[in-house]
Amino acid sequence: MATDTLSIVVEFTGGLEMLFSDQRSHKLSVPKTDSKGAPVTVGWLVNYLCDEIMQDSRKDMFVLDDHVRPGILVLINDADWELEGEASYELQSNDNILFVSTLHGG
């Protein structure tokens, strides 16, 4: 029987975990398709994380103009998301998406 959801793992490091209730790893079950019936993408996931998972009000520390903020490295299954199509990458079951802040205050 086919399922209508994907099981993925989303991780945050470099201080980003503080925006997500200090939880570094999140095992999520997300729909296979968005509200328009298109396959869900990393871009969709970023919005989902902001709307459904992030409890912190400082969303601007994660996104800027509806895009992942500059200075945040995104890895899809240990590969730079630039090699995978960035926000247009279509999520697959068992994907591991890692967000790493490369900016640190001092």
Swiss-Prot record:
It comes from Botryotinia fuckeliana (strain B05.10) (Noble rot fungus). Acts as a sulfur carrier required for 2-thiolation of mcm(5)S(2)U at tRNA wobble positions of cytosolic tRNA(Lys), tRNA(Glu) and tRNA(Gln). Serves as sulfur donor in tRNA 2-thiolation reaction by being thiocarboxylated (-COSH) at its C-terminus by the MOCS3 homolog UBA4. The sulfur is then transferred to tRNA to form 2-thiolation of mcm(5)S(2)U. Prior mcm(5) tRNA modification by the elongator complex is required for 2-thiolation. Also acts as a ubiquitin-like protein (UBL) that is covalently conjugated via an isopeptide bond to lysine residues of target proteins such as AHP1. Pathway: tRNA modification; 5-methoxycarbonylmethyl-2-thiouridine-tRNA biosynthesis. GO terms for biological process: protein urmylation; tRNA thio-modification; tRNA wobble uridine modification. C-terminal thiocarboxylation occurs in 2 steps, it is first acyl-adenylated (-COAMP) via the hesA/moeB/thiF part of UBA4, then thiocarboxylated (-COSH) via the rhodanese domain of UBA4. Belongs to the URM1 family. The keyword Iron does not apply. One of its GO terms (cellular component) is cytosol. Its main location: cytoplasm. CDD domains: Ubl_Urm1 (cd01764). Keywords: Cytoplasm, Isopeptide bond, tRNA processing, Ubl conjugation pathway. This is Ubiquitin-related modifier 1. InterPro entries: Beta-grasp_dom_sf (IPR012675), Mopterin_synth/thiamin_S_b (IPR016155), Urm1 (IPR015221). It is found in: Cytoplasm. The modification 1-thioglycine is found at G106. The lineage of its organism: Eukaryota, Fungi, Dikarya, Ascomycota, Pezizomycotina. There is a cross-link at G106 (Glycyl lysine isopeptide (Gly-Lys) (interchain with K-? in acceptor proteins)).
